[in-house]
Amino acid sequence: MEYQFTHSIHGVVAKCSMDHEAFAGWLNTEITENPKELINIFAEIEKCRAAYPNHYECVFEGKEYSLFLDCDEVMVKANNLDDTFDESQIEDGFQFYDQESIAFCGLEDFENFLKAYQKFSKTYH
């Protein structure tokens, strides 16, 4: 997972590689408004590790995105992705674009992403 952080007058902004765009959307939407939530997320990451090889999962439901953690994988998904969508209304040759709505990565990659965000935020905020 590749990512980049920048700083603007609005604070820290995350950008992620194409297959992981939803992680940037989640961080920019859910975490920048409530950075203390990272404490709870890191605690759940540790619970996932401690539970391994047994199954453990946790969900953080946000206003626009929800975060799903388990021992192996992290998924972030836009809450509106489950809204009913009539694909028959799409013109021929077009597809529904959802790359910014759902993404997956490993638990360790996700933890590294959050730690890099914290470090950048402390350095440039």
Curated annotation (Swiss-Prot):
Family designation: Belongs to the UPF0231 family.
Lineage summary: Bacteria, Pseudomonadati, Pseudomonadota, Gammaproteobacteria, Pasteurellales
Domain of life: Bacteria
Disulfide links within the chain: none
UniProt source species: Actinobacillus pleuropneumoniae serotype 5b (strain L20)
InterPro entries with a match to the protein in the record: UPF0231 (IPR008249)
Protein name: UPF0231 protein APL_0968
Signal peptide annotation: none
